[in-house]
Every structure is written in C-alpha cells, then in structure tokens.
Swiss-Prot record:
UniProt function note: Major role in the synthesis of nucleoside triphosphates other than ATP. The ATP gamma phosphate is transferred to the NDP beta phosphate via a ping-pong mechanism, using a phosphorylated active-site intermediate.
Subcellular location, record wording: Cytoplasm
Disulfide partners: none
Gene Ontology MF terms in the entry: ATP binding; metal ion binding; nucleoside diphosphate kinase activity
EC number: 2.7.4.6
Catalytic activity: a 2'-deoxyribonucleoside 5'-diphosphate + ATP = a 2'-deoxyribonucleoside 5'-triphosphate + ADP; a ribonucleoside 5'-diphosphate + ATP = a ribonucleoside 5'-triphosphate + ADP
Keywords carried by this UniProt record: ATP-binding, Cytoplasm, Kinase, Magnesium, Metal-binding, Nucleotide metabolism, Nucleotide-binding, Phosphoprotein, Transferase
Active site location: H115
Designated name of the protein: Nucleoside diphosphate kinase
Class of this enzyme: transferase
Length: 137
C-alpha cells in the first residue's frame, strides 16, 4: 500500500483545525499509519527543506515552520501521494479548488496549512526523516 507524508503546518495547528484536516484524509480513504505533534528545531526545518536552500523564500519558510508545533503524519492508501495532493489543493490557496484543505483552511501561499510529499521517492525520504520503522503501523 502506498504511503505519503503529511505535515499540518503551524498556521493550521494554531487555528485548531487539526481534526478537520485529519477527517479529510480519513473520509477520502487515507489511513493514518503514524502521527505525532512536534516543535521543529531550526536545524530540523533547514534539513527537511534543504532542497529549497538556494530559493529566496527558504529563510522565511524555515522561520514559519518553527513558529509553532506541527502535526506530522504518515498516510497510507491507494495512490496516497496523488490523493493527498488533490485533497490539499494548489500551493497558493487563492488558486486552490473549493473544498480542498488549502482553500478551506489556508491564509496565504506561505501559511498554506499543509505539506504533502510530491512523489513516492520523496515520500520515503520524508517519512524516514520523521519516523522510525516501528512507529508506522
């Protein structure tokens, strides 16, 4: 069964919509195989988003991701990566389709409520970043 990583970002955690977002996953056939609430350190955020290190938004992204706790989940299901990305909606909530997580809960392209793996290969890397094998069941 396919797995993907989801992060409910600090803006959505602060708004108290964790349960509503998790319900979207479960009611659309994605099973929560692992989950934890964490406060990322600056080093963790920099390492997780290292692929964006040379991009102009990197510093702001890191600062945002350490601004409050996040909820990190492993989602499992048929076509989990693509299904999660469809549920999240476009990166910019103004462009996200109505009924998607970002259209309903995100404030801006920066505070956009959720992160999801963009490929199976990256899902494995991202899952391994946050979870030990025995934490996923």
């Amino acid at each position: 069964m396919e797995k993907t990583l989801s992060i409910i970002k600090p803006d959505a955690v602060k708004k108290g919509v964790i349960g509503k977002i998790l319900d979207r996953f479960e009611s659309n056939g994605l099973r929560i195989a692992a989950m934890k609430k964490v406060q990322l350190s600056k080093e963790q955020a920099e390492n997780f988003y290292a692929v964006h290190k040379e991009r102009p938004f990197f510093k702001d992204l890191v600062e945002f991701m350490i601004s409050g706790p996040v909820v990190v989940s492993v989602l499992e299901g048929e076509g989990a990566v693509l299904k999660n990305r469809d549920l999240m909606g476009a990166t910019n909530p103004k462009e996200a389709k109505a009924g998607t997580i970002r259209a309903d809960f995100a404030e801006s392209i920066d505070a956009n409520a959720v992160h999801g793996s963009d490929s199976l290969e990256n899902a494995k890397i991202e899952i391994d970043f946050f979870f030990k094998p025995n934490e996923i069941c």
